[in-house]
Amino acid sequence: MIMKRKWYVYLFVFSLLMSGCAKIKPDTPQSGKYATQNRLSAVEYSIYINKQLTVFTNQISTRMGSISNLSKDFNVDNEITLAQNSLDILQETYDETATVYPSEGDDANRDATLVVMMTAISHLQSYINDLDKKSDVSGYFKDFENDFNSLTGQAGLYNQ
């Protein structure tokens, strides 16, 4: 009888342990849902967005530096790999940003920020495709510079 109770206790504890092991995944931007239940405060959202925009500006400025080196017998295959890594980071950052509930009154700024982020992602994707085709990519420096300026301009909206 005691042995039977022990098994029930073990089974109960085991089921509790297993129920807490499921991986929690945030909502995707495609679902149209926010991963947070409540709006962040204006300060919290400003800090969060500026952190996300910093990820974008760092990746874009790195690619701008790489474009300068491509004309100096730079390893194009290596640049494709690095640019693809940057693209993955930017896409993940965009997905996270799109699912965070903005602060009160920041809906329009959020939408503008997402457009600027998606534009940078689009330029980076085109850059990778042109690198792969061995096309001239020197024109992307200006695109990335414009993206950088747009991203830093968006950061300024949240610092007011």
Segments and roles (model prediction):
Residues 17-20:
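C-terminal motif of bacterial Sec signal peptides marking the signal peptidase cleavage site
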Residues 1-2:
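Short, Lys/Arg-enriched N-terminal segments with co-localized hydrophobic residues
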Residues 31-78, 118-160:
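C-terminal amphipathic alpha-helix
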Residues 22-24:
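Bacterial signal peptide processing site
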